[in-house]
Amino acid sequence: MANYYEVLGVQVQRFPEDIKKAYRKLALKWHPDKNPDNKEEAERRFKQVAEAYEVLSDAKKRDVYDRYGEAGAEGSCAVGRPFEDPFEYIFSFRDPAEVFREFFGGQDPFSFDFFGNPLENILGSRRNSRGSRSRGSAPLFSTFSEFPAFGGGFSSFDTGFSSFGSLGSGGLSSFWMSYGSDGTGSFKSMSTSTEIVDGKKITTKRIIENGQERVEVEEDGEFSLKSFIINSKEQLLRIDTK
């Protein structure tokens, strides 16, 4: 069994925030979806990083590991005797993918639907044939080399920004998104898109923070009508700008 502190690259007397930051960086670096050409090694490292995080991020498990090391992680003390309360002390590791999703607030940064297109759900039947937009079958994040924000700086995942121009004749005039983490495991992403529908300028903002989704739609940029969707529940709010 590898030394969990060495796996995360942290010292023994580090703060919980340092452990979370180390996990975030290494989990993103070794995620199997990001390493298709080295998947076997990536899966091994990804699993190892998840196990190290599960132990060192939990105060009780970390205390047992600090005192008994590998024997503690396997549920036996230094002299080879089992702990009196195996349920409390034996480390049961979860699926590393589950640890990864939980860390990022239930969202998967490697999934296209993580950012999605809120206009598809909000506008629906309001969009005519000219206003509809076709998209290719390949996911947006299928190849990280084609997505600058997820390129060389993706391993730190501290901040990011990407912008796109028109994506075709569908009327989408602009799209940008930003994302980041504060180092404590919380995650926030925001995307903004502008589209012309029936001659009207529709601007949509979508914010996902720690698993909570908020969508805001503005019509013609006059702030006279806003449609909010919070966790798939739509709410209408009219604001008097006079």
From Swiss-Prot:
It comes from the Eukaryota. Residues 1-69 form the J domain. Signal peptide: none annotated. GO terms for molecular function: Hsp70 protein binding; unfolded protein binding. GO terms for biological process: chaperone-mediated protein folding. Gene3D superfamilies: DnaJ domain. This is DnaJ homolog subfamily B member 3. It comes from Macaca fuscata fuscata (Japanese macaque). InterPro entries: DnaJ_domain, DnaJ_domain_CS, DNJB2/6-like, J_dom_sf. May operate as a co-chaperone of the male germ cell- and haploid stage-specific Hsp70 proteins. Testis specific.
